[in-house]
Amino acid sequence: MKTYVGCCGYCLARSKYYTVFNVVELQETFYDIPDIDKLKRYRYEAPESFAFSLKAWQAVTHPLDLPTWRKAKNVPDKSLSNRYGFLRPTKEVFEAWEKVVEAAEILNAKVVVIQTPPSFGIAKKTIEML
């Protein structure tokens, strides 16, 4: 088993961070559609052995009326609010997930954190959606 130690986000300049830690969890991917060029730059700058994990974009997990969307630069059309979040099996959630997968592939990430809000709850229906 290999142990990874890192932070949620870069707490130091990236060049320094890569010499101190061997993993980072990218939280910025939660708030907005991942910036592909930025992710490519992260992967290029990091040592080959450096590991990335990222949070899935909130369009997959969080309905549009939750406060986490206040930090987002790109908010989907509010008229489609019942089509986003809660891991719903909708075209919009699947398209959002494809963007997460693309980001993970660019980073060669081994882990994608799917963080659901407390309102997702534990019920038979939500467990089945997993």
Show the residue positions of the predicted features.
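Residues lining hydrophobic/aromatic ligand-binding pockets adjacent to catalytic sites
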Residues: 1-130
